[in-house]
Amino acid sequence: MAFAGLKKQINKANQYVTEKMGGAEGTKLDLDFMDMERKTDVTVELVEELQLKTKEFLQPNPTARAKMAAVKGISKLSGQAKSNTYPQPEGLLAECMLTYGKKLGEDNSVFAQALVEFGEALKQMADVKYSLDDNIKQNFLEPLHHMQTKDLKEVMHHRKKLQGRRLDFDCKRRRQAKDDEIRGAEDKFAESLQLAQVGMFNLLENDTEHVSQLVTFAEALYDFHSQCADVLRGLQETLQEKRAEAESRPRNEFVPKTLLDLNLDGGGGGLIDDGTPSHISSSASPLPSPMRSPAKSMAVTPNRQQQPCCQALYDFDPENPGELGFKENDIITLLNRVDDNWYEGAVNGRTGYFPQSYVQVQVPLPNGN
Protein backbone atom coordinates (compact mmCIF):
# COMPACT_ATOMS: atom_id res chain seq x y z
CA MET A 1 0.00 0.00 0.00
CA ALA A 2 2.82 2.38 0.87
CA PHE A 3 4.58 1.72 -2.42
CA ALA A 4 1.34 2.07 -4.40
CA GLY A 5 0.61 5.38 -2.71
CA LEU A 6 4.12 6.66 -3.43
CA LYS A 7 3.80 5.58 -7.04
CA LYS A 8 0.51 7.47 -7.34
CA GLN A 9 2.10 10.63 -5.94
CA ILE A 10 4.96 10.33 -8.42
CA ASN A 11 2.48 9.88 -11.28
CA LYS A 12 0.54 12.98 -10.24
CA ALA A 13 3.71 15.06 -9.93
CA ASN A 14 4.92 13.83 -13.30
CA GLN A 15 1.60 14.66 -14.96
CA TYR A 16 1.51 18.12 -13.36
CA VAL A 17 5.02 18.96 -14.61
CA THR A 18 4.22 17.55 -18.04
CA GLU A 19 1.14 19.75 -18.34
CA LYS A 20 2.91 22.88 -17.10
CA MET A 21 6.24 22.47 -18.86
CA GLY A 22 5.63 20.00 -21.68
CA GLY A 23 2.32 21.31 -22.95
CA ALA A 24 0.41 18.08 -22.37
CA GLU A 25 -3.37 18.42 -22.37
CA GLY A 26 -5.24 17.40 -19.24
CA THR A 27 -8.91 16.53 -18.94
CA LYS A 28 -10.93 19.76 -19.20
CA LEU A 29 -13.93 20.33 -16.99
CA ASP A 30 -17.00 22.16 -18.29
CA LEU A 31 -17.68 25.88 -17.96
CA ASP A 32 -20.36 25.39 -15.31
CA PHE A 33 -17.88 23.63 -13.05
CA MET A 34 -15.26 26.33 -13.59
CA ASP A 35 -17.84 29.02 -12.77
CA MET A 36 -18.72 27.24 -9.52
CA GLU A 37 -15.01 27.02 -8.70
CA ARG A 38 -14.61 30.77 -9.24
CA LYS A 39 -17.61 31.61 -7.05
CA THR A 40 -16.40 29.22 -4.35
CA ASP A 41 -12.98 30.90 -4.33
CA VAL A 42 -14.68 34.28 -3.96
CA THR A 43 -16.77 32.89 -1.10
CA VAL A 44 -13.63 31.70 0.69
CA GLU A 45 -12.14 35.21 0.48
CA LEU A 46 -15.48 36.79 1.42
CA VAL A 47 -15.91 34.75 4.60
CA GLU A 48 -12.34 35.46 5.74
CA GLU A 49 -12.53 39.20 5.02
CA LEU A 50 -16.06 39.60 6.37
CA GLN A 51 -15.09 38.11 9.72
CA LEU A 52 -12.05 40.39 9.96
CA LYS A 53 -13.90 43.59 9.03
CA THR A 54 -16.85 42.78 11.30
CA LYS A 55 -14.50 42.40 14.27
CA GLU A 56 -12.87 45.72 13.36
CA PHE A 57 -16.33 47.29 13.11
CA LEU A 58 -17.27 46.09 16.59
CA GLN A 59 -13.86 46.86 18.10
CA PRO A 60 -12.27 49.61 16.00
CA ASN A 61 -9.27 50.36 18.25
CA PRO A 62 -6.33 48.29 16.90
CA THR A 63 -4.18 48.95 19.98
CA ALA A 64 -6.90 47.67 22.31
CA ARG A 65 -7.42 44.59 20.10
CA ALA A 66 -3.69 43.86 20.08
CA LYS A 67 -3.51 44.29 23.85
CA MET A 68 -6.44 41.90 24.35
CA ALA A 69 -4.82 39.34 22.03
CA ALA A 70 -1.49 39.67 23.86
CA VAL A 71 -3.07 39.29 27.30
CA LYS A 72 -5.01 36.27 26.05
CA GLY A 73 -1.84 34.71 24.67
CA ILE A 74 0.10 35.38 27.85
CA SER A 75 -2.73 33.93 29.92
CA LYS A 76 -2.63 30.73 27.86
CA LEU A 77 1.13 30.45 28.27
CA SER A 78 0.97 31.03 32.02
CA GLY A 79 -2.10 28.82 32.46
CA GLN A 80 -4.11 31.64 34.00
CA ALA A 81 -7.58 32.40 32.66
CA LYS A 82 -8.00 36.17 32.39
CA SER A 83 -11.09 37.81 30.96
CA ASN A 84 -10.25 41.01 29.12
CA THR A 85 -13.15 43.17 27.93
CA TYR A 86 -12.82 45.61 25.05
CA PRO A 87 -12.99 49.19 26.38
CA GLN A 88 -15.96 50.83 24.66
CA PRO A 89 -15.28 54.54 23.92
CA GLU A 90 -18.70 55.42 25.34
CA GLY A 91 -17.73 53.74 28.59
CA LEU A 92 -14.37 55.54 28.78
CA LEU A 93 -16.00 58.94 28.22
CA ALA A 94 -18.72 58.06 30.75
CA GLU A 95 -16.11 57.24 33.38
CA CYS A 96 -14.39 60.59 32.77
CA MET A 97 -17.62 62.61 33.09
CA LEU A 98 -18.81 60.71 36.18
CA THR A 99 -15.46 61.07 37.94
CA TYR A 100 -15.09 64.81 37.45
CA GLY A 101 -18.77 65.54 37.90
CA LYS A 102 -18.59 63.99 41.37
CA LYS A 103 -15.31 65.77 42.11
CA LEU A 104 -16.88 69.14 41.28
CA GLY A 105 -19.73 68.39 43.67
CA GLU A 106 -23.30 67.80 42.57
CA ASP A 107 -24.83 69.68 45.51
CA ASN A 108 -23.80 73.17 44.42
CA SER A 109 -23.07 72.86 40.69
CA VAL A 110 -25.63 72.35 37.95
CA PHE A 111 -22.73 71.73 35.57
CA ALA A 112 -21.54 68.86 37.78
CA GLN A 113 -25.06 67.42 37.83
CA ALA A 114 -25.22 67.65 34.02
CA LEU A 115 -21.85 65.87 33.72
CA VAL A 116 -23.10 63.03 35.91
CA GLU A 117 -26.32 62.73 33.87
CA PHE A 118 -24.31 62.66 30.63
CA GLY A 119 -21.94 60.06 32.07
CA GLU A 120 -24.80 57.80 33.16
CA ALA A 121 -26.32 58.02 29.67
CA LEU A 122 -23.02 57.11 28.02
CA LYS A 123 -22.65 54.23 30.45
CA GLN A 124 -26.03 52.90 29.29
CA MET A 125 -24.91 53.23 25.67
CA ALA A 126 -21.73 51.27 26.43
CA ASP A 127 -23.85 48.46 27.94
CA VAL A 128 -26.04 48.47 24.82
CA LYS A 129 -22.88 48.25 22.69
CA TYR A 130 -21.70 45.20 24.63
CA SER A 131 -25.09 43.59 23.97
CA LEU A 132 -24.67 44.38 20.26
CA ASP A 133 -21.22 42.74 20.28
CA ASP A 134 -22.56 39.57 21.89
CA ASN A 135 -25.53 39.43 19.49
CA ILE A 136 -23.42 39.80 16.34
CA LYS A 137 -20.75 37.38 17.55
CA GLN A 138 -23.35 34.72 18.31
CA ASN A 139 -25.69 35.17 15.34
CA PHE A 140 -23.35 36.38 12.59
CA LEU A 141 -19.68 35.68 13.28
CA GLU A 142 -20.13 32.18 14.69
CA PRO A 143 -22.15 30.95 11.65
CA LEU A 144 -19.47 32.42 9.38
CA HIS A 145 -16.75 30.67 11.36
CA HIS A 146 -18.69 27.39 11.19
CA MET A 147 -19.09 27.82 7.44
CA GLN A 148 -15.36 28.47 7.11
CA THR A 149 -14.20 25.53 9.21
CA LYS A 150 -16.83 23.00 8.10
CA ASP A 151 -18.58 23.63 4.77
CA LEU A 152 -15.82 25.48 2.93
CA LYS A 153 -13.12 23.23 4.33
CA GLU A 154 -15.00 20.15 3.12
CA VAL A 155 -15.61 21.61 -0.35
CA MET A 156 -11.96 22.62 -0.74
CA HIS A 157 -10.92 19.13 0.38
CA HIS A 158 -13.06 17.54 -2.36
CA ARG A 159 -11.65 19.96 -4.94
CA LYS A 160 -8.08 19.16 -3.94
CA LYS A 161 -8.81 15.45 -4.09
CA LEU A 162 -10.46 15.91 -7.49
CA GLN A 163 -7.35 17.63 -8.83
CA GLY A 164 -5.13 14.79 -7.61
CA ARG A 165 -7.34 12.07 -9.05
CA ARG A 166 -7.61 13.93 -12.33
CA LEU A 167 -3.81 14.06 -12.61
CA ASP A 168 -3.55 10.35 -11.77
CA PHE A 169 -6.19 9.47 -14.37
CA ASP A 170 -4.57 11.57 -17.11
CA CYS A 171 -1.11 10.19 -16.29
CA LYS A 172 -2.24 6.56 -16.59
CA ARG A 173 -4.14 7.33 -19.76
CA ARG A 174 -1.17 9.16 -21.29
CA ARG A 175 1.19 6.32 -20.42
CA GLN A 176 -1.33 3.75 -21.68
CA ALA A 177 -1.48 1.80 -18.43
CA LYS A 178 -3.51 -1.37 -18.05
CA ASP A 179 -7.22 -1.07 -18.73
CA ASP A 180 -8.21 -1.98 -15.18
CA GLU A 181 -5.82 0.68 -13.79
CA ILE A 182 -7.24 3.32 -16.11
CA ARG A 183 -10.78 2.25 -15.29
CA GLY A 184 -10.08 2.39 -11.54
CA ALA A 185 -8.52 5.86 -11.83
CA GLU A 186 -11.47 7.01 -13.93
CA ASP A 187 -13.98 5.76 -11.34
CA LYS A 188 -12.20 7.64 -8.54
CA PHE A 189 -11.99 10.74 -10.73
CA ALA A 190 -15.73 10.55 -11.40
CA GLU A 191 -16.47 10.06 -7.70
CA SER A 192 -14.47 13.14 -6.69
CA LEU A 193 -16.02 15.17 -9.50
CA GLN A 194 -19.48 14.30 -8.19
CA LEU A 195 -18.60 15.20 -4.58
CA ALA A 196 -16.95 18.49 -5.56
CA GLN A 197 -19.87 19.55 -7.76
CA VAL A 198 -22.52 18.72 -5.15
CA GLY A 199 -20.54 20.40 -2.38
CA MET A 200 -20.05 23.64 -4.32
CA PHE A 201 -23.66 23.65 -5.49
CA ASN A 202 -25.04 23.25 -1.97
CA LEU A 203 -22.71 25.97 -0.71
CA LEU A 204 -23.59 28.48 -3.42
CA GLU A 205 -27.34 27.76 -3.38
CA ASN A 206 -27.71 28.36 0.36
CA ASP A 207 -28.76 31.99 -0.07
CA THR A 208 -31.66 31.72 2.38
CA GLU A 209 -29.40 30.99 5.33
CA HIS A 210 -26.81 33.58 4.32
CA VAL A 211 -29.38 36.35 3.83
CA SER A 212 -31.01 35.42 7.15
CA GLN A 213 -27.69 36.06 8.87
CA LEU A 214 -27.48 39.48 7.22
CA VAL A 215 -31.04 40.21 8.40
CA THR A 216 -30.01 39.33 11.95
CA PHE A 217 -27.01 41.66 11.64
CA ALA A 218 -29.19 44.52 10.40
CA GLU A 219 -31.78 43.95 13.15
CA ALA A 220 -29.07 44.01 15.81
CA LEU A 221 -27.72 47.31 14.46
CA TYR A 222 -31.23 48.76 14.31
CA ASP A 223 -31.94 47.76 17.91
CA PHE A 224 -28.61 49.21 19.03
CA HIS A 225 -29.20 52.58 17.38
CA SER A 226 -32.84 52.68 18.52
CA GLN A 227 -31.86 52.10 22.14
CA CYS A 228 -29.07 54.66 21.90
CA ALA A 229 -31.51 57.16 20.35
CA ASP A 230 -33.91 56.63 23.28
CA VAL A 231 -31.09 57.19 25.78
CA LEU A 232 -29.91 60.33 23.98
CA ARG A 233 -33.45 61.67 23.71
CA GLY A 234 -33.89 61.35 27.46
CA LEU A 235 -30.46 62.88 28.04
CA GLN A 236 -31.28 65.84 25.80
CA GLU A 237 -34.46 66.57 27.75
CA THR A 238 -32.60 66.30 31.07
CA LEU A 239 -29.82 68.63 29.92
CA GLN A 240 -32.34 71.20 28.70
CA GLU A 241 -33.92 71.14 32.16
CA LYS A 242 -30.49 71.60 33.74
CA ARG A 243 -29.77 74.52 31.43
CA ALA A 244 -33.07 76.18 32.41
CA GLU A 245 -32.25 75.55 36.07
CA ALA A 246 -28.83 77.16 35.67
CA GLU A 247 -30.35 80.19 33.90
CA SER A 248 -32.99 80.66 36.61
CA ARG A 249 -30.53 80.59 39.48
CA PRO A 250 -29.71 84.04 40.93
CA ARG A 251 -26.17 85.09 40.19
CA ASN A 252 -24.04 85.12 43.31
CA GLU A 253 -22.12 88.30 44.05
CA PHE A 254 -18.45 87.78 44.68
CA VAL A 255 -16.22 90.15 46.63
CA PRO A 256 -12.50 89.26 46.46
CA LYS A 257 -10.85 89.03 49.86
CA THR A 258 -7.96 91.27 50.86
CA LEU A 259 -4.95 90.48 52.98
CA LEU A 260 -6.71 92.05 55.96
CA ASP A 261 -9.49 89.45 55.61
CA LEU A 262 -6.87 86.72 55.95
CA ASN A 263 -5.88 88.00 59.46
CA LEU A 264 -2.17 88.07 58.66
CA ASP A 265 0.27 89.04 61.44
CA GLY A 266 1.30 92.69 60.92
CA GLY A 267 4.84 92.25 62.26
CA GLY A 268 7.24 92.17 59.33
CA GLY A 269 4.38 91.83 56.88
CA GLY A 270 4.64 95.36 55.55
CA LEU A 271 1.35 96.44 57.24
CA ILE A 272 0.82 98.38 60.45
CA ASP A 273 -1.98 97.66 62.86
CA ASP A 274 -4.36 100.16 61.31
CA GLY A 275 -3.91 98.66 57.87
CA THR A 276 -1.72 101.49 56.55
CA PRO A 277 1.33 100.32 54.61
CA SER A 278 4.59 101.04 56.42
CA HIS A 279 7.19 103.27 54.78
CA ILE A 280 9.14 101.56 52.03
CA SER A 281 12.32 103.11 50.69
CA SER A 282 12.08 104.12 47.06
CA SER A 283 15.51 102.68 46.49
CA ALA A 284 14.62 99.25 47.86
CA SER A 285 12.66 96.69 45.92
CA PRO A 286 9.35 95.67 47.60
CA LEU A 287 9.74 92.14 46.22
CA PRO A 288 12.18 89.45 47.37
CA SER A 289 15.08 88.57 45.13
CA PRO A 290 14.00 86.23 42.31
CA MET A 291 17.29 84.31 42.55
CA ARG A 292 16.97 80.94 44.24
CA SER A 293 19.46 79.52 46.67
CA PRO A 294 21.88 77.12 44.94
CA ALA A 295 21.26 74.57 47.67
CA LYS A 296 17.50 74.72 47.09
CA SER A 297 17.93 74.56 43.32
CA MET A 298 19.84 71.31 43.71
CA ALA A 299 17.30 69.84 46.12
CA VAL A 300 15.45 68.07 43.29
CA THR A 301 17.50 64.97 42.64
CA PRO A 302 17.70 63.34 39.21
CA ASN A 303 16.22 60.10 40.55
CA ARG A 304 12.87 61.77 41.09
CA GLN A 305 12.76 62.82 37.48
CA GLN A 306 13.61 59.38 36.11
CA GLN A 307 10.83 57.18 34.79
CA PRO A 308 10.66 53.46 35.60
CA CYS A 309 12.85 51.76 33.01
CA CYS A 310 14.95 48.73 32.24
CA GLN A 311 17.82 47.77 29.92
CA ALA A 312 17.58 44.97 27.37
CA LEU A 313 20.00 42.10 28.02
CA TYR A 314 19.28 40.39 24.70
CA ASP A 315 17.44 40.99 21.43
CA PHE A 316 13.72 40.13 21.62
CA ASP A 317 11.76 39.37 18.44
CA PRO A 318 7.96 39.44 18.99
CA GLU A 319 6.02 36.34 17.95
CA ASN A 320 2.47 37.43 18.86
CA PRO A 321 0.40 40.60 18.29
CA GLY A 322 0.93 43.15 21.05
CA GLU A 323 4.48 42.06 21.96
CA LEU A 324 7.27 44.67 21.97
CA GLY A 325 10.45 43.92 20.07
CA PHE A 326 13.80 45.50 21.00
CA LYS A 327 17.56 45.18 20.64
CA GLU A 328 20.25 44.47 23.22
CA ASN A 329 21.10 47.50 25.41
CA ASP A 330 17.89 49.36 24.48
CA ILE A 331 16.46 51.40 27.35
CA ILE A 332 12.76 50.53 27.72
CA THR A 333 10.26 52.61 29.68
CA LEU A 334 8.24 50.43 32.08
CA LEU A 335 4.49 51.07 31.99
CA ASN A 336 2.96 48.14 33.85
CA ARG A 337 3.61 44.65 35.15
CA VAL A 338 1.28 42.08 33.58
CA ASP A 339 2.27 39.11 35.76
CA ASP A 340 5.37 37.52 37.28
CA ASN A 341 6.98 36.94 33.88
CA TRP A 342 5.83 39.82 31.62
CA TYR A 343 6.11 43.60 31.57
CA GLU A 344 4.33 46.23 29.48
CA GLY A 345 6.68 48.93 28.21
CA ALA A 346 7.54 51.44 25.48
CA VAL A 347 10.60 52.03 23.30
CA ASN A 348 11.10 54.15 20.18
CA GLY A 349 7.45 55.25 20.18
CA ARG A 350 6.12 51.67 20.31
CA THR A 351 4.35 49.95 23.20
CA GLY A 352 3.76 46.29 23.95
CA TYR A 353 4.56 43.31 26.15
CA PHE A 354 7.91 41.61 26.72
CA PRO A 355 9.34 38.90 29.03
CA GLN A 356 11.05 39.92 32.26
CA SER A 357 13.96 37.52 31.67
CA TYR A 358 15.18 39.60 28.69
CA VAL A 359 15.76 42.81 30.67
CA GLN A 360 17.43 44.20 33.78
CA VAL A 361 15.34 46.70 35.73
CA GLN A 362 17.17 49.97 36.41
CA VAL A 363 14.38 52.11 37.86
CA PRO A 364 11.53 49.93 39.23
CA LEU A 365 7.84 50.69 38.93
CA PRO A 366 6.31 52.73 41.80
CA ASN A 367 4.84 49.59 43.37
CA GLY A 368 8.32 48.11 43.66
CA ASN A 369 7.92 45.48 40.90
Curated annotation (Swiss-Prot):
Domain called BAR: residue spans: 18-248
GO BP terms: autophagosome assembly; cellular response to starvation; clathrin-dependent synaptic vesicle endocytosis; membrane bending; membrane tubulation; plasma membrane tubulation; regulation of synapse structure or activity; synaptic vesicle endocytosis
GO-annotated cellular components: cytoplasm; cytosol; glutamatergic synapse; membrane; type I terminal bouton
CDD domains (alphabetical): BAR_Endophilin_A, SH3_Endophilin_A
Cell location: Cytoplasm; Membrane
Location of the SH3 domain: 305-364
PROSITE patterns: BAR, SH3
Location of region: Disordered: 275-297
Protein name: Endophilin-A
Organism expressing this protein natively: Drosophila virilis (Fruit fly)
